[in-house]
Structure formats: structure tokens, C-alpha cells
Amino acid sequence: CQVPAYISYLPDTEKTFMKRLKENGYYTAVVGKQHFAESTIDKGYDYEMIVDGHFPTAPKEQLGVYLDYLKENGIEPDSLYEKNLISGGTWKGDIKYHIDNFIGDKGKEWMENRLSDTENKQPWFFTLSFPGPHHPYDLEGTKYADMYELNDMEFSESTYEDLEQKGPQFRNMGMYSQIYLKDYTKEQFLKTKRSYYANITLIDEKIGEVLEVLKKYNAYDDTVIIYTSDHGDFMGDYGLVEKLQCLEESLMRVPLFVKPPIKDFEGVHIKDDVLNIDVAATCME
């Protein structure tokens, strides 16, 4: 593909699969993160509410409607978060002001508005994309973090030195990281990991609320649902915490659930390797 890394821009001559769905009669919409960056390509959405960054470290121009929401409610962004963990910290505000809570609520709102319009028979394709789970890991101090006991959490046994046993592409990747476990205490790391888990739990809760809207309008059984992520984090593997651009198990092994439009579908676990690139082709079929 002549693409050295994922940080690249789609040329205007390309056509997204959302655009193809739109051309074939679907109403297309997105709420949340897209990461098209500086590309000026037509994304192919009829409706857009894009929030590209992960608060609180993202440039303000990427946070758009989320910052507007905070301002409308008299919330100063810097008051919501205290940095006191490894690449993360403690959430100090009401959880309803967290960016992933905001995205989830807006996704639920879109779904409610769409399905309540019973006169509209046009098929739809909806992307709900959460900025998290992502550094900074900012949900320590919340009810979601309280679900996890530090004593029950695992501390990675692999270290930065273990990279020396691997190929050059792995031996060199550590130099690009700025976060090393050796610089922190075990408690600091476990709280950071708990905050990461808490972010996942918050997102799971918000997705559940959207699914309940589908069930409320008897649309769940007829809807294809794809749940996935773009990457994982090291979370202690090789003594690293965040992510890097490399082919490493903890970064690449992400969830990919597909619920077909089949009533009472029980599920099948497929162990074959699959790629996110297959999602577009699956949607087009």
C-alpha cells in the first residue's frame, strides 16, 4: 500500500465505503471520533458530529461540540481532571461531563430520533466511535474504577529488557516510547491500568444504552452490529504503558464482535485471523 504508518491521509480521489452506502440509498451518520486528520475527502456521511480528540490532551480544535457542551453547562475543562497517574489521572467532575459519556449520550440521542420517526423507511448506517479507551487514562476516582480491586489486577512480568530477545523492529520500538514502568511504582501502574479498565466499562455501559433503544423500537433483531477497536495498549508488556506503531500482540488483538440480523443468534467463536480492513467489505455485502 506504500503506507509506512497509519498516520497518513486519504487522497480526495478515494471513495469511502460510507459514501458507497450513501450512493446506494442508505442514510449515513457518525457520532464521535473519525481520525481522518487533514484529509479533505468526502467522508460520505449525511449527518456528522465528529469529536476527534481524547480529552484532556487533544487540541481544542478537535473537540468542537464537546467543548461547546462544557461551556454551555458552565464547566471549566481543566477542573475535570487531575494528572496524578502514569499518562493519566483522577476524574474530578461529574461523570456526565466525560467525553466518552458525552459521545454515548449523543449516539443514544441520534438512535432515538431516528427510530422514533416511524414514517422514515430509508435504511441507515450509523457509526458510534468513542475516543476511549485511550491515554490519558482519566477515570480513576469514579464508580467504574471502584469495580476493580488493585489486589486482583495483574502486574506484567515482561520487561523492557525482554525486547532485546526480539527482532530489530521490536528492539528499536522502545526508543519511541516516553512512558516506562521502571520510572513508577507498582501502585501507580495498577491504578493506571484500573483507570484504563474503567474507561472500557464506561463505554460498554453507553453502548448498552444504545442497544436498549434498538430493542425499544423492535429494531435490534434486524440490525447488523459490529463492535471493535482500532488498537490495544501495552499496559505493562515489555515495561511499556501506552501504544506504538508496531505489530505487537497486545496492540493488535482487539475485540471484533459481529451480530447478524438473526433473531436469538447464539454466536460463534472464530479463531482465524481477521483484520479491521474486512469490516468495510462485510458492510458492503
Name each model-derived stretch.
Residues 1-285:
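Formylglycine-dependent sulfatase
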